Amino acid sequence: SEVVVSLFHVRDERTVQSRIEEAVEDYSRTYKTEDSQVKLLYESGGKPYLESRAVELSISHSGELWGCALSKEPVGLDIQLIREKGVCSVAKRFFHPEEYRYLQETGFSDFFSLWTAKESYVKFTGEGITDGFSAFSVVDSQGLLSSVNGAELKLIPFLPEYRICVC
């Protein structure tokens, strides 16, 4: 299924609702869908959804970026501003042992690629960050996987100080 990712600068004064309305309008124009109900609601776990359920969405923000991914199928989006501080301890605590070994071998340079891949996947599944975050791996001996349990992971090149992944 096609996914549309809309990115906004956080200094953009529009509300989350108006940003989502613009993203849904862009998606609807591109894929010729109708979604007149652009009312944002939240599931008990905090995952946002559109009242009409005609289009799935995922929202993320970090640093100066805010983004929204839209698709007819479940979707997960994560944006991270790269910060070097504390990545080793975070990886040791939250990542799968295979991922931690991979990061040790690569000097933790791919930490944010792995983090955004993992977070986009758990947003895709609707689980969010739970105790199961270390139960799955997004790497093998060759590096970052292109999919996890049949769900495609796609890193989106953008500004060098950010990592963005959609699942």
Where are these regions (language model features)?
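Core catalytic alpha/beta fold that binds nucleotide/phospho-ligands
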Residues: 1-167
